[in-house]
């Protein structure tokens, strides 16, 4: 068997790895980078650009530069997640004839697998250039919480790229493989927290090592397939748009070119704030009106960024708690925490994860490369080059059929180890019923309509009989890729109907084949600057904390008491935009003094609720010399997030 490469097909970046002897190696692309932006552009001269070259020209070609396609793959156009993205993407998202979400570039409608295939082709070529031989086999990773439709669509993308997809494996599982192969001692329970560009997964995985044999068993998985770095970027972009609108009276959302520049600058600012306390978004000539060109120059502090995205980070807590519950484990049972995905570099994310688990996550796992490395290891297992490794993954969602009364009856429960096969006997609902419709569903709701419809088929030719007499055996066979095969058999006549679930939509084999064919053809100054940034950070934190308190206990104050607070807030927000540290500090103190009645109201409310300790903490958060950012986080610590 030829080499089987491992590909991490990411929302923001992709990565390819291969076994080099018995060690996995991440392969650099033609530009010398170990990861490739998952960006595809279609130019005026008919050229298709992938990766960094596509990213570089995005500002001048926003409508034909496609990114974050993974958020659309295997989704219906009417899905709320898709409708949300339509308003923020510079390119067109359209509905296909079969109801799927497609994209449009250069006037041509394209299926997401067709677009993703361009990234996979670059990964394939990268591997071939390194190995000096043709590569046809691949293990491709997907978010653990991808449903059947999304997994099928990913396999389709592989086929279109000219790859035989040997296995689809879950990203957290792949990361655990990369982490666990060099851990030689005993047993370990790890939590893989995977926050990437477009998706979030949490998996609890038990790694057993006995006499050199490794078993990786997924105990539970959970997540959100529409939560990731792109959402963090969008919060930054929206903030910049609103600030510019307040300053200049111009809405940049109507200008695709400006929005593309903002996207690039917003992402860069977010990344910079992981290692610095302040950055400035400076975009000259962002737009123009009758008075002439307009320039965008907005300072962004880490405290402000964190206030913008705090709820997103919290949103990962519930899946985390659910995964622990499903695995019958407590936080104390987790030996190690692995962070995967570029967004986990954000200090706020690391803070929440550390507080939740009560321990620091590991720092020896590369969040950008671990998934591809794990996929390459699995490729080695499949090709026979890696021995003594057993991978036991699970299905993320329950699978079942619709039964009488619109109820979903599950045949395969969530977190069942795959592959698996389950059968159950059903009967007719009416007398002399000659046919039954098998409606296949995926999800956790008892009401059928609350779940994802994967498809349906009919079993006909049932002999006339009273209701409840015929015996129809329905079998669900879930393969190692997490893809479902369903059969229904009449035990009386022996008649049987089988299908491989292709979702109620998706690409037909003919469409995939056509796409396959198409794809072929200086010290003081520094000290002063640091002090200025510190003052800005403190001011931003104070503004955020005060506004939060106004929302929570503002009703307890009269309009006369609120007015000076709002006035002080406005004055401080204006001062923060300037370069005068003394002015910022003075306005911060004025806000603290103006907010005294607000603090008293908050203390009174907490005391009434029996929260003396909380009231003490709340009072301390208004002190000028406190680290305002920390105090702000202490306020929400009970809710903490991931």
From Swiss-Prot:
InterPro entries: ATPase_NBD, Chaperone_DnaK, Heat_shock_70_CS, HSP70_C_sf, HSP70_peptide-bd_sf, Hsp_70_fam. SUPFAM superfamilies: Actin-like ATPase domain, Heat shock protein 70kD (HSP70), C-terminal subdomain, Heat shock protein 70kD (HSP70), peptide-binding domain. The modification Phosphothreonine is found at residue 199. It comes from the Bacteria. Keywords: ATP-binding, Chaperone, Nucleotide-binding, Phosphoprotein, Stress response. Pfam families: HSP70. Residues 605-624 have a biased composition (Low complexity). Residues 627-642 have a biased composition (Acidic residues). Residues 605-642 are annotated as: Disordered. GO terms for molecular function: ATP binding; ATP-dependent protein folding chaperone; unfolded protein binding. Induction: By stress conditions e.g. heat shock. Coiled coil: none annotated. Belongs to the heat shock protein 70 family. PANTHER family: HEAT SHOCK PROTEIN 70KDA (PTHR19375). Acts as a chaperone. This is Chaperone protein DnaK. The lineage of its organism: Bacteria, Pseudomonadati, Pseudomonadota, Gammaproteobacteria, Alteromonadales. The gene is dnaK.
């Amino acid at each position: 068997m030829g080499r089987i490469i491992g590909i991490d097909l990411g929302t923001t970046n992709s990565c390819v790895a291969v076994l080099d002897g018995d060690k996995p190696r991440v392969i650099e692309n033609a530009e010398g980078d170990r990861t490739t932006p998952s960006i595809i552009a279609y130019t005026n001269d008919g050229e298709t650009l992938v990766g960094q070259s596509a990213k570089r020209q995005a500002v001048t070609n926003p409508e034909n530069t496609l990114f974050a396609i993974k958020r659309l793959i295997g989704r219906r156009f009417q899905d709320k997640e898709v409708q949300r993205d339509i308003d923020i993407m510079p390119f067109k998202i359209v509905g296909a004839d079969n109801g799927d979400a497609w994209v449009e570039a250069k006037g041509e409608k394209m299926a997401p697998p067709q677009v993703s295939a361009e990234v996979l082709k670059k990964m394939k070529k990268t591997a071939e250039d390194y190995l000096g031989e043709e590569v046809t086999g691949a293990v491709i990773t997907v978010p653990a919480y991808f449903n059947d439709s999304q997994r099928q669509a990913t396999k389709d993308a592989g086929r279109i790229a000219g790859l035989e997809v040997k296995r689809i494996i879950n990203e957290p599982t792949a990361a655990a493989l990369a982490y666990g192969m060099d851990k030689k001692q005993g047993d370990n329970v790890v939590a893989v927290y995977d926050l990437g560009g477009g998706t979030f997964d949490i998996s609890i995985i038990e790694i057993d090592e006995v006499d050199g044999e490794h078993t990786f068993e997924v105990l539970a998985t959970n997540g959100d397939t529409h939560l990731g770095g792109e959402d963090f970027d969008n919060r930054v972009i929206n903030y910049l748009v609103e600030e510019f609108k307040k300053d200049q009276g111009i809405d940049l959302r109507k200008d695709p070119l400006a929005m593309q520049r903002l996207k690039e600058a917003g992402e860069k600012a977010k990344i910079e704030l992981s290692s610095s306390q302040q950055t400035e978004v400076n975009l000259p000539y962002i737009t123009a009106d009758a008075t002439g060109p307009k320039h965008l120059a907005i300072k962004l502090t880490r405290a402000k960024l964190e206030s913008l995205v705090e709820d997103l980070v919290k949103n990962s807590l519930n899946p985390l708690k659910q995964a622990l519950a499903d695995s019958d484990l407590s936080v104390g049972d987790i030996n190690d925490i692995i962070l995967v995905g570029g967004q986990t570099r954000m200090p706020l994310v690391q803070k929440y994860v550390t507080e939740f688990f009560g321990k620091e996550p590991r720092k020896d796992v590369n969040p950008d490369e671990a998934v591809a490395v794990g996929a390459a290891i699995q490729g080695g297992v499949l090709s026979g080059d890696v021995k003594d490794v057993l991978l036991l993954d699970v299905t993320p969602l329950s699978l079942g059929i619709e039964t009488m009364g619109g109820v979903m009856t599950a045949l395969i429960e969530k977190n069942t180890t795959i592959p698996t096969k389950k059968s159950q006997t059903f009967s007719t609902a009416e007398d002399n019923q000659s046919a039954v419709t098998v409606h296949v569903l995926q999800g956790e709701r008892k009401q059928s309509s609350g779940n994802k419809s994967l498809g349906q088929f009919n079993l006909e030719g049932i002999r006339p009989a009273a209701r409840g007499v015929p015996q129809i055996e329905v079998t669900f066979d879930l393969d190692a890729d997490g893809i479902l095969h369903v059969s229904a058999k009449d035990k009386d006549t022996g008649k049987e109907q089988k299908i491989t679930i292709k979702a109620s939509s998706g690409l037909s084999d003919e469409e995939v084949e056509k796409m396959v064919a198409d794809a072929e053809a200086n010290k003081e100054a520094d000290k002063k600057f640091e002090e200025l940034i510190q003052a800005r950070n403190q001011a931003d934190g104070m503004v955020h904390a005060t506004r939060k308190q106004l929302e929570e206990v503002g009703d307890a104050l009269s309009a006369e008491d609120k007015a000076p607070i709002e006035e002080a807030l406005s004055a401080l927000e204006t001062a923060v935009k300037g370069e005068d540290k003394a002015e910022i500090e003075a306005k911060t103190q004025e806000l603290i003094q103006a907010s005294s009645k607000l603090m008293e109201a908050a203390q009174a409310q907490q005391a009434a609720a029996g929260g003396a300790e909380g009231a003490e903490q709340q009072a301390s958060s208004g002190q000028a010399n406190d680290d305002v950012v920390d105090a702000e986080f202490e306020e929400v610590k009970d809710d903490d997030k991931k």
